[in-house]
Amino acid sequence: TGADVSFSRVPKKWFIKGDKDKNYYLCANAVQNVSSETADNALKAMKNWSGIDNLKNIKNETLIVWGDKDTSYNFEQVDTLNKNIKNSRLEIFENCSHNVHLEKPNEFNILVEKFINQ
């Protein structure tokens, strides 16, 4: 199905190096276990859902991490989170795609540790 094709392509876009990234297999394996029906339902839900009105209800300090090469979420979407979550902070990682935590794990872990301990 179209969902199968889409889901098989998605993990490549989550890494700057695509399927050549050392951690690509983690995401590729994860989507292999998704049924066609589940994949199709997920795509429909993502297309038709918006949680923007609910963002104002988030009161906790929130760290938003985004890779500047992410093709899953564009900057406008991430900026919407940052502008609508009162206590949020946006950190942008250069030369990273969707999986910042896998592409730059040391820098990501340092950032999260500092955020938690602030």
Q: Which sequence ranges carry the predicted segments?
A:
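Conserved alpha/beta-hydrolase catalytic His-Asp/Glu region
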Residues: 2-56
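Hydrophobic "lid"/C-terminal helical patch
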Residues: 10, 43, 81, 108-112, ...
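Glycosyltransferase donor-binding loop in the core domain
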Residues: 31, 47, 70, 97-100
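Structural signal for short hydrophobic segments within the conserved structured cores
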Residues: 44, 63, 89-91
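Short beta-strand/loop motif that positions the catalytic acidic residue
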Residues: 58, 64-66, 70
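Active-site acidic short loop of glycosyltransferases
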Residues: 59-60, 87
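Conserved alpha/beta-hydrolase "acid-adjacent" motif
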Residues: 71-77
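Catalytic active-site module of serine/aspartate enzymes centered on a nucleophile-bearing elbow/loop
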Residues: 88-118
